[in-house]
Amino acid sequence: MPRKGPVAKRDVLPDPIHNSKLVTKLINKIMIDGKRGTAQKILYNAFDLVQERSGRDAMEVFEEAINNIMPVLEVKARRVGGSNYQVPVEVRAERRTTLGLRWLVNYSRLRGEKTMEERLANEILDAANNTGGAVKKREDTHKMAEANKAFAHYRW
């Protein structure tokens, strides 16, 4: 925690091709070692594959996929009287998009296809169809929150 008060939240600039801040955030999640050009190339090639395979606009499919991945509820550990409870809490809008993008990239990296472009494209298509690793992660998160609904009164 900085001594001079809270740190100002920096806003991302929209990407040059789709003019979308969400796409810029995804590029930042894909980027490794500051190689933005490589990350952009991967994403735009993946979008081309998505458009080719789905026959729809890649941005529409991507937004649908992200909406299917973003969690509404999650659990947070809360210590009460010597024992830890998994307390279900609602996820703030900013964190929802962050988690959605993070899960999309992480589960893309775990896939078996040869190139990252193919992995990302297939994960986006799967997420748009409510299947795939990232959507399963969201379902598991919601299941955990549902299972621990009894501890909801410990919310803070």
From Swiss-Prot:
Family: Belongs to the universal ribosomal protein uS7 family.
Protein name: Small ribosomal subunit protein uS7
Domain of life: Bacteria
Main function: One of the primary rRNA binding proteins, it binds directly to 16S rRNA where it nucleates assembly of the head domain of the 30S subunit. Is located at the subunit interface close to the decoding center, probably blocks exit of the E-site tRNA.
GO molecular function, one term: rRNA binding
Assembly and binders: Part of the 30S ribosomal subunit. Contacts proteins S9 and S11.
An annotated GO cellular component: small ribosomal subunit
SUPFAM superfamilies from the UniProt entry: Ribosomal protein S7 (SSF47973)
InterPro entries per UniProt: Ribosomal_uS7 (IPR000235), Ribosomal_uS7_bac/org-type (IPR005717), Ribosomal_uS7_CS (IPR020606), Ribosomal_uS7_dom (IPR023798), Ribosomal_uS7_dom_sf (IPR036823)
GO biological process: one example: translation
PROSITE patterns given in the database record: RIBOSOMAL_S7
Alphabetic keyword roster: Ribonucleoprotein, Ribosomal protein, RNA-binding, rRNA-binding, tRNA-binding
Claim: Ribonucleoprotein is one of the keywords in the record: yes
Keyword hit for Zinc: no
A Pfam family of this chain: Ribosomal_S7
